[in-house]
Amino acid sequence: MAFRDHLGAAETISQPISLIHGMWEYSKANQHPLLVFENILETPGHKAAVNLLTRERLCAAIGISPEEYIDTLAWAMENPSEPIIVDAKEAECFQNQQDSVDLEAIPIPHHWPQDRGRYSSASVIIAQYNGIRNMSFHRQFLRDKNHTVVRLVPRHLRTMMTTARANGDTVDIAVVNAPDPVVLLAAAMSFDDNIDELSIAAALHEKLYNQPLRLTKLANGVEVPASAEYVFWGKITLDNDDEGPYVDITGTVDDVRQEPVIEFDGLVHRDNPIFHALIPGEAEHKTLMGLPRSPTIKDAVSKVCECIDVHMTEGGCGWLAAVVKIRKKNPDDGIKAIEAALAGHRSMKMVTIVDEDIDIADPVRVEWAMVTRWQPDKDTICLLYTSPSPRDGIG
């Protein structure tokens, strides 16, 4: 199923809306429902969607209950599959191609007034170098018609780029906007090893949609989901430029940094394309980042004790804090679970371990468990000298 197939419940907004703060202001004023803006002043002929990927909407879109999603993602991690390759003539993303690349002509939004400018926050980057492929999320500041500046946190893509630059090489990439939600989930997962996230997406496609994941090859050799709404391709150059400020997942403003410049050589899109214009710091952002962390935390904790469930908390912005439910069998299971959970998601700042009778999605029940069962001097550990998340508002 394509991205657009999951927008049936969206409210269509026909009134003229500016991509400069307009979509953000309208969504905020209406409590962030699922919206499709079809009359964007600066980019006629292009639509934009926001607020699709809340936990409940995402699970409904891919046909599983919220209680099943952790085990479904964990299954895909253990059972990767291979996508199939289709010719560009069969790929919906190739229905239209710009004569010359003009990213300013598509609805990349400037949501928050504090942001540096227009940002693509929901697009995934697929990169290939030295036989390794990586798919991951990285926000991109729209610098001009054919350049963006990409924020690369210290994970696999930055390592790939650093290796390439040491050899004097650029990195071939594609930027994919609005593939189906299964691809987005796989792209949001992170692993210690260089696992091909598209193989995880392919496994999820087969399990949830009963069909293979279709990819098509671009001019630079990078393979991308064939049904995506937008695809643009080029290379991570040897140059850096200013990136930020940017309102991040915590609602705090991230710093200005020197980050890599991407230069684009081609842009294609579907007929009547719909840009995924995620609003940073809101529920969709937190869901997309937080949901894929839960199975990695559960997997890590399950190696030291019996882990039942994991919940990334709303107060922790879906990223910095979690509640983990275990079935305690040994006196030190709780402490071991804390250490394992923090190792399973290294950006996490706080984790709370509770017994199997607690509803971990209910903050009142979690607080009750703490005040009735937690002894701070015995049941608390603090890990010193660890690296903070770059999204930690304190740093």
Task: Give the residues covered by each predicted segment.
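An N-terminal JmjN-like helical accessory module and its immediate linker preceding a catalytic domain
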Residues: 1-55, 367
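Flexible loop/turn segments at secondary-structure boundaries
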Residues: 2, 19-21, 43-45, 142-145, ...
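Conserved mixed alpha/beta core segments that line enzyme active sites in large multi-domain catalysts
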Residues: 6-28, 73-261, 267, 295-300
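Low-complexity, highly charged intrinsically disordered N-terminal segments
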Residues: 46-84
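Short, solvent-exposed amphipathic alpha-helical segments in soluble enzyme
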Residues: 54, 139-143, 190-193, 247-252, ...
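C-terminal substrate-recognition/cap domain of FAD-linked oxidoreductases
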Residues: 241, 245-333
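Substrate-recognition/cap regions that form aromatic- and gly/pro-loop-enriched pockets
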Residues: 314-381
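Conserved small/polar residues in nucleotide/adenosyl-binding loops
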Residues: 385-392
